Amino acid sequence: MAFFSTVKARVFVLFFILLSNSVQAQKDQLVIPRDVRSAYEKGTRSPDGQPGANYWQNRAEYDIKAELIPAQRRLRGTQQIIYYNQSPDSLNRLVIRLYQDILKKGNLRDWPVNESDLHNGMVIERLLINGQSFDLSAGNETVTRSGTNLTIKLNQPISPGNQAIVEMDWYFTISRTSNIRMGAYDSTTFFIAYWYPQIAVYDDVNGWDTYNYSGIQEYYNDFNDFQVEITVPKNFMVWATGDLQNVSDVLAPEYVQRYQTGQISDTVLKVISEDDLARGGTTLYKDKLTWIYQAHNVPDFAFGSSDHYLWDMVSLVVDERAPRRVIINAVYNPQSADFYGVADISRKVLEFFSTRMPGVPYPYPVMTVFNGSGGMEFPMIVNNGSQSSFAGTVGLTAHEIAHTYFPFYMGINERKYAWMDEGWAVMLPWEFQSSMVENNDRLATTIVEFNFSSGKEMDLPLLTPSIVYSSHVHYPGYRFNSYTKAAVAYQILRELLGEDLFRQALHEFMRRWNGKHPLPWDFFFTFDAVAGENLSWFWNSWFIEPGYPDLGIGQVKQKSGKSEIEIIRHGNMVIPVQLRVVFDDDSEEIIKKSARVWQNSVERIIVPVKHKKKIKRLELGHIHIPDINRQNNTVTF
């Protein structure tokens, strides 16, 4: 795409490294697990970081008609899925995710729930595949329902290049108190996610993704098209993934005009105000209204609905070359004081992401921030709770919108590699957060959090599959690895490569893999290619091996006009060196060295300092550099 930097990558021939299955003999080699290695052998992945010549992925088209029944807290739906098998394999079964079975009585989950929210799971009233009806009652050997997966053995396999048509009628009860990323927030406010029966991912590494949805782990979806009709009672509005297709069929004419004006407005416009709610008549006078949304090439669909939410709208040109303008909505409870500024914050953060970091124009036509609870991302819409501080509102808004790029634009498998999206969502908005809130150094705060947990028992290597943390007991480890540790790793990589080369590599990774399913090794090899060097020593240190960062000052040899200062790497994680030399007149010199000095397993370096004055104090490190033990970082003479 035009907005990406042009990169002429110097690609190393690394086949012998990439396809190695033995324990590494040298620190500059990466080991690839057997199941992942097979993808490179089959040519679906390439050792230069590109999608392979034989790369493929499946997709689907969803046509969903759903009705929200607030009085019953029920969502009822009928849907048709056209599933396209673009793999080289004949598929003799289909795996369908029934996310709402997480609240099914007797099912395992790693998220605490209120017993009153437990139910019979997703109730499926009809299932047809290519016109064949399937009996879901117990004892049918062609159907297996386990955890949150429904697996159907097919009489006629789906051959390569062919498709299957899946038709279903279903309903479920919406949770009231155990709101795992969705639910009822009051009697007439709902956020609906993880809701429709969804065909699981079948990929080139593991075949069917059969991990159950247990609460902690989030996304791994194919890129699909959605046509969704959502029927709600009169006075209810619906905000969702995608473009609203029939605004004139649901809003009263006055509000249609406001909606259309807001689509091109550079200042925040109130589509629905408190006075409007008090007066009534914001929607057309019908007992039921059907809101129609379309979304193309996205990994999921979610929506929110309420009859008493305020609605602010503004827009932004995210790509001057197109030019392309994005609609930004904030919809919220009138009691949520912080949300009155969210539309403006969202516009500013979209501008930052589009032009600064990552510097890739926001890829979708809409962004809606819905005032529900917690903080959870979905394509083109996020579900955010109210925050007690402006810094909290800025941080949550920026973080959830950052997920647009990772995992949605990039198709990340969060179930296995949550650090490939959460870490970026922490790191990308740091500068924005600092610019919006005085004395809000989020990088420094993250380093403090990192230093507290790094090297402890729950600190596992980043490449540990996220599903390993599938227990609420293990959530602190999941949180540290996926968010804090990954964000710091990306920042150290940024410092190592320098700003320009880091951006080139990030842009190239995004250009190559947007709309696909990159693995960690695709990320590693792309950065190797763009950097023009084998960075395995860095990947091993930060992503593969257990460990922690700890630098200390060793021996100091002082001579006339020159001193030699020994810096010792006590920990095995590589970090940059920053040495502050304070002289007896309180003047100072700052010496910086890249983490590259620790390449080739170097454990100590000598930093020479030329000086005419007497050294009074040496201080190693910085608030932006992780180091779990600062006690060995200072020497006073």
Which ranges hold each PLM region?
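Short, hydrophobic/aromatic-enriched beta-strand segments in well-ordered soluble domains
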Residues: 79-81, 96-100, 154, 162-176, ...
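Beta-strand-rich binding/interaction modules
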Residues: 239-240, 304, 556-621
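Hydrophobic helix-coil surface modules that form long, contiguous segments used
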Residues: 201-203, 217-398, 427
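Early extracytoplasmic/domain-onset interaction patches
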Residues: 28-97
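Hydrophobic alpha-helical and helix-loop surface patches within well-folded domains
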Residues: 25-47, 58-60, 293, 327-568
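A surface-exposed beta-strand-loop module
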Residues: 84, 112-188, 276-286, 290, ...
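Solvent-exposed beta-hairpin/edge-strand motifs
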Residues: 91-136, 193, 231-236, 582-592
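Glycine/proline-rich low-complexity spacer/linker segments in large multi-domain proteins
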Residues: 106-117, 171-226, 247, 624-637
